[in-house]
């Protein structure tokens, strides 16, 4: 039993000391400092180059006010997908 008490006292004496500013009670800093400080994102000082726009030819003269029939809509979607397939290399 005495050996156990001696070991406990030695381990308590070897423990890191508590800074005086943090001792006693709980301050708001101790309660709310749960998360690491936020780091602002790094933005380069110059704009990054943009990818060139690829013109997608429409298979027919397109009027934005015109109502598309289902066949014209499928033809338009197929044309756009074919253009993208060639661009993506699939």
From Swiss-Prot:
GO cellular component: extracellular region
Compartment(s) where it occurs, according to its Swiss-Prot or TrEMBL record: Secreted
Signal peptide coordinates: 1-15
Keyword field: Secreted, Signal
Domain of life the protein comes from: Eukaryota
Principal cellular location given in the protein's record: secreted
Keyword Signal: yes
Organs and tissues of expression: Expressed in enamel organ.
Protein function: Tooth-associated epithelia protein that may participate in structuring the basal lamina at cell-tooth interface.
UniProt protein name: Secretory calcium-binding phosphoprotein proline-glutamine-rich 1
Organism: Mus musculus (Mouse)
């Amino acid at each position: 039993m005495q050996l156990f008490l001696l070991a406990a006292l030695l381990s308590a004496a070897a423990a890191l000391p508590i800074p005086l500013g943090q001792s006693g009670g709980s301050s708001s800093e101790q309660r709310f400092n749960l998360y690491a400080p936020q780091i602002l994102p790094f933005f380069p000082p110059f704009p990054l180059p943009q990818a060139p726009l690829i013109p997608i030819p429409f298979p027919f003269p397109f009027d934005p006010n015109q109502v598309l029939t289902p066949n014209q809509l499928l033809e338009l979607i197929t044309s756009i997908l074919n253009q993208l397939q060639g661009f993506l290399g699939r």
